Amino acid sequence: MSSQPNKNLKVFDNPNIERNFIIQINMPEFTCLCPKTGQPDFATLYLEYIADKVCIELKSLKMYIWSYRSKGEFHEAVTNKILDDLIQISNPRFMRLKAIFNVRGGIYTTIIAEYQQKNWTFKTKIDLQYQG
């Protein structure tokens, strides 16, 4: 597997497909570029998901996240694009991506995007707030 930034997300078989378990991934080094100024925007990404048939392979996720370092993207667009790509590759039962961007011009931005499979519900109430 390449150690260069790329968009090639990989998955592996869910080892406990019969169970709803939460996978939480903290990515504190996300960087993209402001599409207006070209200046870097820094964020911490919090991914929470309940896998269905496959789980996301972590090294490929790291390389995928690094691929945004030279891309000009608005916070809202990049958060939703990442979520869409992760959903497309893994088709999770549930997925939430929270992007907390560092201060820019005195303003902090947090974007939260979610997805849930149609006809899938968790049998008990669950709080998926990242505890990291």
UniProtKB/Swiss-Prot annotation:
It is found in: Cytoplasm. Its main location: cytoplasm. Its EC number is 1.7.1.13. GO terms for cellular component: cytoplasm. GO terms for molecular function: preQ1 synthase activity. The active site is at residues 34, 41. The keyword Oxidoreductase applies. Belongs to the GTP cyclohydrolase I family. QueF type 1 subfamily. This is NADPH-dependent 7-cyano-7-deazaguanine reductase. The keyword NADP applies. One of its GO terms (biological process) is tRNA modification. Pathway: tRNA modification; tRNA-queuosine biosynthesis. Pfam families: QueF. Substrate binds at residues 56-58, 75-76. Keywords: Cytoplasm, NADP, Oxidoreductase, Queuosine biosynthesis. The gene is queF. It catalyses: 7-aminomethyl-7-carbaguanine + 2 NADP(+) = 7-cyano-7-deazaguanine + 2 NADPH + 3 H(+). Catalyzes the NADPH-dependent reduction of 7-cyano-7-deazaguanine (preQ0) to 7-aminomethyl-7-deazaguanine (preQ1). It comes from the Bacteria.
